[in-house]
């Protein structure tokens, strides 16, 4: 508990230092939307970032996506994410997102520099920052927190006694709280993840409906909360023979998975293509949100000074 108190004091003081100008922060000429969380572990940020980028493009904006690039080993920043970028270079989540969105994207641990690159070199008129809620060195205009419906804020304690990076009071200071799952509370917005057809890793033109899986299969996941993937499969009547769980951002090797039918997440698939078995499949998911959430987001964006 003393360590938790210390963590709280440090996080509180750090945010205060940026908000008061004691520590410098970067302000770019385009509005910045932060999509983050106050807890560790997977909460569903990536599908929301993809959805926001597609939605804003459809509404006439020129979005750019900024990521930390966790798990990548690039040393040349800001690093543009292209169709040829590798997970080992820029991280698995940026590669996944680049497959889904058609807008500029860069990774940079210095988020202010990355945001400036998107504005100045790619002419973006809105920046979507994947994670970075606690990275106050980049000024933001709209903050969106994503929470897992089942785990929510856990035991409500900060690290290391609990899962929180910031106190639950922070939820009252952000613009939107999006709950991935169900059972939203007052003031929260529901996000559901809708799976499409399975896609073959070796031949992406091959698709397979979940309803066509008659025999039990192996499921594998190296994400922040693997159980959410397994539960998603079970909700769609997929019979699981076994579940292989790995740490988030796991660097897969051929020996990690059996040479038989395996279902995995889209995030894991980008790291397994080079050695994929013919019967390995990934499941794309799309974020669904209330149209009222989208309209309120547009209204806030238009009111950014």
From Swiss-Prot:
Listed HAMAP family: LpxK
InterPro entries tied to this protein: LpxK (IPR003758), P-loop_NTPase (IPR027417)
Keyword terms of this UniProt record: ATP-binding, Kinase, Lipid A biosynthesis, Lipid biosynthesis, Lipid metabolism, Nucleotide-binding, Transferase
Residues the record lists as binding ATP: 39-46
EC number: 2.7.1.130
Pathway the protein acts in: Glycolipid biosynthesis; lipid IV(A) biosynthesis; lipid IV(A) from (3R)-3-hydroxytetradecanoyl-[acyl-carrier-protein] and UDP-N-acetyl-alpha-D-glucosamine: step 6/6
Protein family membership: Belongs to the LpxK family.
Keyword Transmembrane helix attached: no
GO BP annotations listed: lipid A biosynthetic process; lipopolysaccharide core region biosynthetic process
Function (record text): Transfers the gamma-phosphate of ATP to the 4'-position of a tetraacyldisaccharide 1-phosphate intermediate (termed DS-1-P) to form tetraacyldisaccharide 1,4'-bis-phosphate (lipid IVA).
Protein name in the entry: Tetraacyldisaccharide 4'-kinase
Lineage summary: Bacteria, Pseudomonadati, Pseudomonadota, Gammaproteobacteria, Alteromonadales
GO-annotated cellular components: plasma membrane
GO molecular function: ATP binding; tetraacyldisaccharide 4'-kinase activity
Catalysis performed (reactions): a lipid A disaccharide + ATP = a lipid IVA + ADP + H(+)
Enzyme class: transferase
């Amino acid at each position: 508990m003393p360590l938790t108190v210390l963590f709280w004091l440090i996080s509180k003081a750090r945010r205060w230092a940026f908000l008061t100008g004691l520590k410098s922060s970067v302000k770019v000429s385009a509005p910045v939307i932060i999509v983050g969380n106050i807890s560790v572990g997977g909460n569903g940020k990536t599908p929301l970032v993809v959805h926001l980028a597609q939605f804003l493009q459809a509404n006439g904006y020129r979005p750019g996506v900024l990521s930390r690039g966790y798990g990548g080993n690039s040393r040349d920043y800001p690093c543009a994410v292209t169709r040829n970028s590798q997970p080992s270079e820029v991280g698995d989540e940026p590669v996944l997102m680049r497959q889904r969105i058609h807008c500029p994207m860069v990774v940079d641990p210095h988020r202010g520099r990355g945001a400036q690159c998107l504005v100045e070199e790619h002419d973006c008129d809105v920046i979507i920052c994947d994670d970075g809620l606690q990275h106050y060195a980049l000024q933001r205009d709209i903050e969106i927190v994503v929470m897992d419906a089942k785990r929510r804020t856990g035991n409500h304690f900060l690290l290391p006694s609990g899962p929180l990076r910031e106190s639950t009071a922070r939820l009252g200071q952000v613009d939107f709280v999006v709950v991935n799952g169900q059972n939203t509370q007052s003031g929260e917005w529901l996000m559901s993840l809708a799976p499409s057809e399975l896609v073959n890793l070796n031949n992406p033109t091959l698709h397979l409906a979940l309803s066509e899986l008659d025999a039990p299969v192996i499921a594998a996941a190296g994400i922040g909360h693997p159980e959410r993937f397994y539960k998603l499969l079970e909700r769609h009547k997929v019979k699981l023979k076994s579940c292989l769980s790995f740490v988030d951002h796991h660097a897969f090797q051929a020996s990690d998975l059996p040479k038989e039918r395996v279902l995995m997440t889209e995030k894991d698939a980008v790291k397994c293509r080079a050695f994929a078995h013919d019967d390995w499949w990934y499941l794309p998911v799309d974020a669904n949100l209330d149209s009222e959430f989208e309209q309120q987001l547009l209204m806030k964006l238009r009111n950014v000074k």
